[in-house]
């Protein structure tokens, strides 16, 4: 059994496990918990009644957080020639082609998001086993396989995040930092919840979003009533 710190136990005592909170209430409760000497990350976690093994129930997409994540993403771009120059000018942190592909194949993973031009995907596809499990594989559906590398890089730097349901039907989102105002965290949470609801597969009958939680790096999760997200 994991031994929790005194601060964690104190925070956990504030959460009524017989109650489901609104997002506003959950965020306010989270911010009232004991503080730490660093700016904690705040996350939202959803449980969906989907079967990710079925292609038509693999919920994935992107969402632009109105207040960003509180973290500037390190963006890697696979491109060559003028598009490589364009990516660098747009603010990409790492840009390259064949040599960079080899570097990633060799274990280099110091980046948070990946963009590729379509002509690079034949070779980038070899990185599926490296990037896929980490949710980093470029995909046209999420705007990360594109000729408009400027827009892709600026969107990611501006707070655009990519998500994909895991094998257990869970979705996790970074929605900001504990230093954010409650209203900013609430608006970021609403943005991700609205996008998840919009992507409900037509083959899913009955309740789709079955559980929601807001949590932070060092504190327990606060359960949010899914009915308040309708």
UniProtKB/Swiss-Prot annotation:
Q: Which UniProt keywords apply?
A: Repressor, Ribonucleoprotein, Ribosomal protein, RNA-binding, rRNA-binding, Translation regulation, tRNA-binding
GO-annotated molecular function: rRNA binding; structural constituent of ribosome; tRNA binding
Which cellular component appears as one GO term in the record?
A: large ribosomal subunit
Give GO BP annotations, semicolon-separated.
regulation of translation; translation
The domain of life is Bacteria
- InterPro entries in UniProt: Ribosom_uL1_bac-type (IPR005878), Ribosomal_uL1 (IPR002143), Ribosomal_uL1-like (IPR023674), Ribosomal_uL1/biogenesis (IPR028364), Ribosomal_uL1_3-a/b-sand (IPR016095), Ribosomal_uL1_CS (IPR023673)
Q: Sorted alphabetically, which Pfam families does this protein's record hold? A: Ribosomal_L1 (PF00687)
The entry assigns this protein to a family as follows: Belongs to the universal ribosomal protein uL1 family.
Per the entry, what this protein does is: Binds directly to 23S rRNA. The L1 stalk is quite mobile in the ribosome, and is involved in E site tRNA release.
NCBIfam families from the entry? rplA_bact (TIGR01169)
Per UniProt, subunit arrangement is: Part of the 50S ribosomal subunit.
Which named protein is this? Large ribosomal subunit protein uL1
